[in-house]
Structure formats: C-alpha cells, structure tokens
Design a protein with these regions (language model features):
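Mg2+-dependent endonuclease catalytic cores in nucleic-acid-processing enzymes, primarily RNase H-like
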Residues: 1-118, 137-141, 147, 155-158
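Short, hydrophobic alpha-helical segments
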Residues: 130-138
Length: 158
C-alpha cells in the first residue's frame, strides 16, 4: 500500500500527508503521544485531532491476555517483532518492493547481546503497531454512488 516517514516536520505537514491517504483511516499512537510538545505545550495527540486526523481514542497496547480487559497488554516490542516474523514466514504479511524505506529498515534491523537495537526503525514500529492492533480493524462501508435505478433517474428533477 503506502508508508509515510519524514523527520523534523510540523504537525500540520504530517496531518496533511496522513489525511491525503484517507481521512477515515484510524491512526494508532504511542503512550507518549500525550506528552506536551516542547514548542506549544500541547500534547501531540490533541494537535493531530485538531488538524482533523482520525486518531484512535486510546494509545497503543498489545493484545491483552485472554480474559483480561483491553489496554492491559503492555507495549512489548519483542511480542510485536515476533508476530511480524511469524506472519512473514506464513505468508500472511508481505511487503511490496516499492516500500524501499521499510525494506531498508528491515535489512538493518538487528540485535546486540540478545536485545533489539532500536535505531532507524520508525516504519518497523508503525508496522508493528498496525499488526498488533488488527483486533480493532474494521472495513470501511461505502455508500452506493447512485441510489436510484437508471429508469428512475431524472436529470431534470430538482
């Protein structure tokens, strides 16, 4: 599909790029999205909402364990990376070859002393959030473009 990743840009610029991909698309955000922006003093989530971005009502968490309530799943990176790996191995996650930036991040992704090195992994993190939030995914229902049959349609009707 598509990806977007630009550093050091303003909220209005990011908002415009996000909305251009579909205003209805829900945006998943990390817990630190509630932190105040250094420039304005307002939290980033509220700034994006004000710009018309469809922000999810709550911050990202991994799926909860069976029987526990939503929001208790934590935000373990390891769980998300392993889910991505399993999905790739079972052909349930495919990355298009036009996703150069993501493919580069995947090539550079590595561990040191058994721990994931969090460096230049913005798109990997976004993909991890997406995969771990699939439980909340919904299809967009489109309204029919024309509600009248051809025989009922009257170009001169008011």
């Amino acid at each position: 599909y598509d990806s977007y990743s630009i550093r050091q840009e303003t909220v209005p610029v990011h908002s415009s790029a996000i909305k251009a991909r579909g205003k209805w698309i829900p945006v998943i955000w990390p817990q630190d999205g509630r932190q105040a922006d250094k420039g304005s003093g307002k939290n980033l989530t509220e700034q994006y909402k004000k710009e018309g971005v469809n922000m999810c009502p709550e911050w990202f968490t991994n799926p909860p364990q069976k029987g526990l309530r939503e929001g208790t799943g934590g935000n373990s990176v390891e769980a998300g990376i392993m889910e991505m790996l399993v999905r790739m191995q079972t052909k349930r996650l495919k990355v298009f070859k036009n996703q150069n930036k993501l493919l580069e991040e995947l090539r550079m992704h590595h561990r040191k002393d058994g721990k994931i090195v969090p460096m230049n992994d913005d798109l990997i993190s976004a993909l991890r959030y997406c995969i771990m939030s699939l439980r909340k995914a919904r299809l967009k229902i489109y309204e029919p473009l024309q509600q009248l049959t051809d025989s009922e349609f009257n170009v001169f009707a008011r």
